[in-house]
Amino acid sequence: MIDRYKHQQLRIGLVSPQQISAWATKIIPNGEIVGEVTKPYTFHYKTNKPEKDGLFCERIFGPIKSGICACGNYRVIGDENEDPKFCEQCGVEFVDSRIRRYQMGYIKLTCPVTHVWYLKRLPSYIANLLDKPLKELEGLVYCDFSFARPITKKPTFLRLRGSFEYEIQSWKYSIPLFFTTQGFDIFRNREISTGAGAIRDQLADLDLRIIIENSLVEWKQLGEEGPTGNEWEDRKIVRRKDFLVRRMELAKHFIRTNIEPEWMVLCLLPVLPPELRPIIQIEGGKLMSSDINELYRRVIYRNNTLTDLLTTSRSTPGELVMCQEKLVQEAVDTLLDNGIRGQPMRDGHNKVYKSFSDVIEGKEGRFRETLLGKRVDYSGRSVIVVGPSLSLHRCGLPREIAIELFQTFVIRGLIRQHLASNIGVAKSQIREKKPIVWEILQEVMQGHPVLLNRAPTLHRLGIQSFQPILVEGRTICLHPLVCKGFNADFDGDQMADHVPLSLEAQAEARLLMFSHMNLLSPAIGDPISVPTQDMLIGLYVLTSGTRRGICANRYNPCNPKNYKNERIYETNYKYTKEPFFCNSYDANGAYRQKRINLDSPLWLRWQLDQRVIASREVPIEVHYESFGNYHEIYAHYLIVRSVKKETYCIYIRTTVGHISFYREIEEAIQGFSQACSYDT
C-alpha cells in the first residue's frame, strides 16, 4: 500500500465488505463482472484444466500461461493491435500469468460469519466492545441460544420479555410448534436474531464515542468509591476498572483507524490468489495440494448447502437452517485458525490441516521466512563474537564475507585504477587474493556502512548500521554494548549483514541507523546501551581486588597460627610488601612486566583534596622514619607528613584494575565534554 506521502507500507487490519469486493471483482472487456467463487472444484479430472467459477478459475484469477486462454488461443501480451484482449468463448483475458499471484476472489456467504480472531483470541475484541461474557457470545454465534434482543425498534413480544431468555428453555422448542413454517420464518426474521447476524446487528448499533464516555464515567465512579474491605469485591472492582480501560483504548483505536465494529463479522470471504495455495504435480502423476484449498472447498460446500436450504426448499425446518449456519461458521473458523475452538480438524491420514493462521505465523510463516527472512543479494551471515577493542559504531567483518559483499565495488576499483582490463581479469585477481585487492577493499569499506540484523526483528533496534573493518577469522566482531538492542549474546547467535546500495539507503544508514545514535529505547526511553552479562562480570573482576584488607600486613597469611584448620603451603603464599607508585603509568608498567597482579593492592600517589578526608577519622597505624617523617595509614589512603605535620603527599590504596577502569571513565568524560564544546 502507498499512502499520500508515497510511503510504501504493509498494514494488516479489518476492511469493509465494499473493499473486499473492490479487491476481488473485475470487469472483463465484454462488461461481465467476475470474481465470485461459487464452485468447490479445482481442476477437471479429464482435461486437467481449472473448473469455471472454481478455486482456480482462469476467468477470475487470470491465465495459467501468459497470453494463453482456457481454449488454447494465444495473443501477444501488450500488443494493442491484437483484438480482442480476451477470449470471447471462455472469457479469459490475455494477460501475464503473474496476475495469479495477486488477483483475489471472494465467496459470498449466505449467512454472516464472525471473524474468529476477534471473537476467540484473548482479549476478545467483540466481547470487550459489547461488554458481554465471551461464553454468552459464543453460544449466540454457534446457535446454542436462539433468542436474542429484538432487532426491531417496535414494542414486540420478545422486547417485553427482555433479552437472552435462559430460564424458560422450553421456548426454544415450543414456539416453532405454534407457527407454520412461513409464519415462523416471518417471526424469526423479525424478532429472533441468532448466529453471527445477531452480533453484527449489535455491533452496528454501537456508538464508539458514547462507549468511551460511559466507560470513563463508570471508571471514575469506581475510583471514587474506594476499598470496600471485602477482598473479593475489591478484586472485582480492580478487574472491572482494567476492563474499562481496555474497552476505551479499543474504541479509540477503532475511531482513529476509521474501522467500523461490524466489519468483524464477515459477509464476503476473500479467496487467496492461486499461486499462494498451489496444487503441484509430483512424481508418479500424483497431485499435492495446499491445505488451504481443502478448507476453502469445505466452506463452499457448506455455504452452497445453506443456500439451497433457504432458496429451493421452503419446507426446511428452522432448526436445520440454524444447524447449517453453525456448520458454515465452523468451516470459516477452521479456514482462518484451525484448532482455536478446541480439537483441530484433520485429514484422512490424521494430519492436522494448516489454516491461514498457521501459514502466516511463526518462524516458518509467510512473513518471517519468506518476506522478512528471505535470502537477498549482497548479504551474508555468520556467528557473532565480542570485539572489546571496537568502537561503538564499528563492527568487524571477516575477509571472506567482506570480499563477497563488496566484490562489485572492488572490481570497479581495479578497472578504474587500470589494474584489470575487464571483469574477468578482476575476478581472477580477487580469487588469487592479491595484496592490491585488500587495499582497494579497505578504501571501499571506509565509505560504505553495513547493516547488521538479528532475527527476530521485533523492533527498530533489531537492525542497525555499522562502519565495517576487516578482521581475521570467520566470525563477525561486535561491540558488547549494542547487544541489548539486538537481544543478542555471544553463545552462538548469528547475525545477517547487508550492504545498502542506493544513496537513499546509505544516507538513512548514516543519519538514522548508526548504533551510536540509538542509545535509548524507542519504546520507554530508557538507556539501552548498558553493560550486560560478560561486561558486568568483567567489570566486577577488574575492580574486585584482593580480599585482604589493610590489616594484611599485621595478619600475614603465611602465619599458620591464623589458619589453624587449614593447611598452608609456603610456596603458594608469599608475603610481599604493598608497592608504592608515583603515577598510574608506572603501575601499568609493573603489571605488564608481571611484577604485580591485576588485583594486587598498591599505593598510588594521588592529588586528593584533603577536605575529602574525614577530620574525625583516626589512622589505623602510624609509621615513623628516622628523620622524623611519619606515615598515617588509613583504610583506603596514606598521608606522608613531616615533623612539622605538613602534608608531603597522599597515596590511595587501589589496584591496577581500578586504575584502568578509572582511566577509561575519565577519557570517556573528556571526550563527551569536547564533543559538547564543539556543538556549542
UniProtKB/Swiss-Prot annotation:
Primary residence: plastid
Catalytic activity, as annotated: RNA(n) + a ribonucleoside 5'-triphosphate = RNA(n+1) + diphosphate
One Gene Ontology cellular component annotation held by this UniProt entry: DNA-directed RNA polymerase complex
SUPFAM superfamilies xref list: beta and beta-prime subunits of DNA dependent RNA-polymerase (SSF64484)
Cofactor(s) the protein needs: Mg(2+); Zn(2+)
Co-factor binding details: Binds 1 Mg(2+) ion per subunit.
Pfam families in the cross-refs: RNA_pol_Rpb1_1 (PF04997), RNA_pol_Rpb1_2 (PF00623)
Keyword match Transmembrane helix: no
UniProt keyword Metal-binding present: yes
Domain of life, per lineage: Eukaryota
Function: DNA-dependent RNA polymerase catalyzes the transcription of DNA into RNA using the four ribonucleoside triphosphates as substrates.
Record family assignment: Belongs to the RNA polymerase beta' chain family. RpoC1 subfamily.
The name this protein goes by in its record: DNA-directed RNA polymerase subunit beta'
Organism: Crucihimalaya wallichii (Rock-cress)
Gene name in the database record: rpoC1
